[in-house]
């Protein structure tokens, strides 16, 4: 078995054994779904947003998710407080820059988080990563209309600028720390028929980052498992609604051995 695949399977086994708490400061649209995905992969979710409690809550967490999908000034303050405390504790922070490039507020907030905090992984679509990297990309609402001309260059530039891992997700997922590159080829087109699947993917990345300090591999592991679950779910589904149910079932039922055998992760950008 490929060593990367074996490590991905081992990560899932550690998640299931340790049940890390994943602290989300996330958007109102996906809160219930990402909480359930956290449970199904093997972690424990908490959605704590108030500035008075986030520093205390994140002290118990294995990872922190910052998702800017439904922004407000109070939530931005909470993200910065929680992120700084997570950095003090060396707890990984995973950023989902929902809609970056669509409005000045979203772009400005994401850049502030990247400059103010030590972000372990940025997980975004082509439009979002293109906008934040300066390589170009168009976002309509929160959906990517067009990505950068060279997605790998955009991901590398963002990773190098902010000393982070960037996971650019799409038909294939490109993951880089600015030097190393992994490509995940798992996934299914039906993921585009549901709201919040990108946010669910971010939650999967955070769960893997909670047990693996090589965040490049952690991001690949979370995305490979999520994509594999989608592939298997599509075999049982008849449309978006049944696909969502099957997706959650597959995330819950997949074993470390199945994930290790089914992950399609290659080194390099192709």
From Swiss-Prot:
Any one Gene Ontology molecular-function term assigned to this protein's record: magnesium ion binding
SUPFAM superfamilies with a match to the protein in the record: Ribokinase-like
Residue positions binding substrate: 47, 196
Keyword Nucleotide-binding: yes
GO process annotations (BP): thiamine biosynthetic process; thiamine diphosphate biosynthetic process
Keywords, comma-separated and alphabetical: ATP-binding, Kinase, Magnesium, Metal-binding, Nucleotide-binding, Thiamine biosynthesis, Transferase
Keyword Magnesium in record: yes
Pathway listed: Cofactor biosynthesis; thiamine diphosphate biosynthesis; 4-methyl-5-(2-phosphoethyl)-thiazole from 5-(2-hydroxyethyl)-4-methylthiazole: step 1/1
InterPro entries reported in the protein's UniProt record: Hyethyz_kinase (IPR000417), Ribokinase-like (IPR029056)
EC number(s) per entry: 2.7.1.50
Cofactor(s) this protein cannot do without: Mg(2+)
Top EC class of this enzyme: transferase
Binding site for ATP: 123, 169
Function comment: Catalyzes the phosphorylation of the hydroxyl group of 4-methyl-5-beta-hydroxyethylthiazole (THZ).
Family affiliation: Belongs to the Thz kinase family.
Protein's name according to its UniProt entry: Hydroxyethylthiazole kinase
Gene name of the record: thiM
